[in-house]
């Protein structure tokens, strides 16, 4: 060891006497002798213990260090061993001089002579690596003072730790390890006080290999180890399977090659234990390949070296110097090399794949990643038990090594930095300091919230700033847990501003210099900024985890800070610039509403010159010339009554036009005008209606009341003048119905006849059937004295109503008679006969479009503002509608009706009306009605005259054949026969497009329904038509009776009309409607009759639009509107959705159907991706496709999106929704697929049979319902099904 002591700066203790025998160093990797020319001899199994004479390092060795600033000496690369079994270059012959280690930090372990006492390392934390016999478990030394566990079959003596005697010195001439030349970077020595031991003098310790000498490796696994062959003889290489790589943050890997198979391994003794050493090796050690590499080679000898189980020789354990990296296991068959590697654990590429061993988690200080997932166990038949046990011991001993490495790093910064500045500038010491900091950070972080709640917040920022990377692992907090002020401050920050302001605020956490001001600056910012910004989640999410307690405590102690940082809150410039919101010019410029010039030009109304000039009334020339009245040939020839058969069979006669005429006057003049002016005024009304949606009462009732007094005053006189044209009530005699000209056939005789299914309220009360006029159940049950008169105010609302979906369906029922009606309009002269009895207008049906009363004074009468884009109304003057059967009807009724006339109550009463009511009802005392049952019945006027809602006037003929154009439009309402759910008239308010039905007119309180048109004679009922496309219309075939007063809409019907509008608006957004929503928004105070109102609205929807209200959820009572007309063709889907969306929906529904009505979300998205549609990307057609499928279609109830139970992470599946089942069927889906694939549906046999079974089932149910409904109509009209 004198060579070691002669090195520069050698501070080792003085050499001790060493035995003279076995002077050659023990080389763990043997090279053949120089004089040997024999072929390679297989190695015998290595000795029982790879106990290299690793003497403890007792003091720093400056000889291993190079002067500061000097580059290391050039290092020759070690020749890489070839593949398994390939010949390998041998080491130089035995006895050759060993070159000085060119690379600093190389630990060469040599074997001492057998039986020589070894200096035992007194420092804990040394990893002893001993080869073992194949099959013998590998033993590892326990910590100091721990009793040893022996492997099976091995006896171990544990003598007390005597002072370790020095090992014998090498024989003369033995090449020893020389220190590197000056300037070679060496390992750092530990600071003073480090319990590291140096080898005693003369200890044959580590010898570096000769420069460029190749390393000798053992043979492959399972092959007997060859003896050291002659120099230059190829030797087999050992694959070295089962490499354990214990990685540390500091670069430096110890790769230890396991021994040859069959070599028994004896567990090393505890500290200072005596152990038998193997025979000395005479093979010189090759030069290490690189700096800082420890090469531990198994000993090789000419004969098998077998270690005794128990030995009295002390074993010398090596203690790595402070700068020495920790040990790992070398992969493949490479020499036992301690390489300075990166922190990446590299898996051995050539080791065959074997069952994965459990990961060995080394108990290391924080920051030392020691898992070895790539450690392949038991390759090539190597016993798994020794390796597994060995891993356990390594795991147990690793903490000691880490603990040893931590202290020197903290204590020796100055020495390490001065000696190894060129090579190791210092990241390793910094990394060694991190573990204690990490241990301290956690308690600081735990204490941070309470400290922030209190005033001193200083410890928190240091913990946050010193370890920012730990925050990255924490998940973002839920946004709903933020403080109230956070939610209040966020809306004022624009979305784009939040993203831009998050990074600077989030980075405040990383500034440790901010001191105690950091929490005061950062926390308020987190209150307002990083929470809603998803882009900053990667950075701000970790920092936000600990913020909820801070946020909740911020208002207490740090309220001014959010006030100091409301800059993003004070920068809601986009919100302060809601110019589009502040410039609702279209809302403030309802010029069409403010320019109801006909309404704003009531100058003729204010100039009641026509009223003051009752010249037309004083010119009863038409009354004196009652040529039409004296020509009641239609009345005297009750052709409609005598021709019921062809009308009932619907297809007997083609009709010429029948003019339903009412006096047409300008909306603001009570004077006769020319036909051209009337057309212009009608056009203006139509334009205003299109521009002005129905927002309540477009025109005040007071403006219209100015028109009424004169006519009301003239009522009694006019009635006296026309006794011959007044008709008796329908129940008092044969009612002269709509009479056609003698030469004209019935106009609408060929209207198709609708179904006779009765309508029933959800409560079980009957609605009117197709052929039976019925009043509401309440009205039928109510006595006559409970019925009230009409309200005092009345106005007409002309509205253009276009059916959005029922139009196409109803066009199919348009008779040719209407198509042939001429469009010529004539002006009816405003003579006294224009208003023969009163100024009341009673539409032919009480079911004309009756929204909320336009002239009502309380908001309750308008529960819902009818803002449907399809309905517009216009206030029109009150004029009576009287059907006018004339030969010119065909020339006057060609125009398609486009204005819906709405009649409200009128404050009118006459003696004739009172007399008419007396004929069927007991007299009632005059005055206001005292009944308070929610105004469900007509009210009684001041005169005490009360009219039932069933009492209507019959149509009255007029002498003057001229008529206006909008009375022709009104004719459509008169042709309808569908009555409301509570009135016996033909059509409901919405002009139900029911196919032809038998007309129902006046029904007396005590007469049978079959006499309502024909009187007591029991003659056949007269006819009525019902359908015109895209127009809602009322109806009445009843001839207007001058002795009876018109009645207002029932409040239930008003609410039903408003509910229809509400449902249509909701259906445009495809949003299901709940019963509670309908009650709260529309029905309101009539909630006791909510089911009745809903049933009426359902009937109106079905008759007018071909839709039906369906309940899709019985628990929440959720309803949707389903199109019945387009069921087999599934046209509703295409009409509602845009074409691309409809196609996507059909593809999704088809795939779900083919997969058994259920498909996983990921499978669906992968299928769409194969079609070229990425659901994650934003496209121009669907925006975000995933959101369209999983949100929009689900909200529309086309799809059902639910989580698959017991899935982690959560997975979802898609199914058909209730709307899909209602609007389409399996047959249609199969046809869609067949058209898509250009095949027949029969190729999918299973789905095809399933679809046929569903179709047959539905047909059977439909037939059963038809038969049941026919029985109900014949016997019990109250059994219509609930609209489910």
Swiss-Prot record:
Gene behind the chain? Magel2
Q: Which SMART domains match?
A: MAGE
The alphabetized list of GO BP terms reads:
Arp2/3 complex-mediated actin nucleation; negative regulation of DNA-templated transcription; positive regulation of actin nucleation; protein K63-linked ubiquitination; regulation of circadian rhythm; retrograde transport, endosome to Golgi; rhythmic process
- Composition bias (Basic and acidic residues) maps to 775-792, 937-954
What's the source species for this entry?
Mus musculus
Q: Where does it sit, as one GO cellular component term?
A: endosome
- The identity of this protein, by name, is MAGE-like protein 2
Q: What happens when the gene is disrupted?
A: Deficient mice show reduced embryonic viability, neonatal growth retardation, excessive weight gain after weaning, and increased adiposity with altered metabolism, including increased fasting insulin and elevated cholesterol, in adulthood. Mutant mice also show abnormalities in the circadian pattern of feeding behavior. Deficient mice show features similar to those of Prader-Willi syndrome in humans.
**Positions with biased composition (Low complexity):** 675-686, 761-773
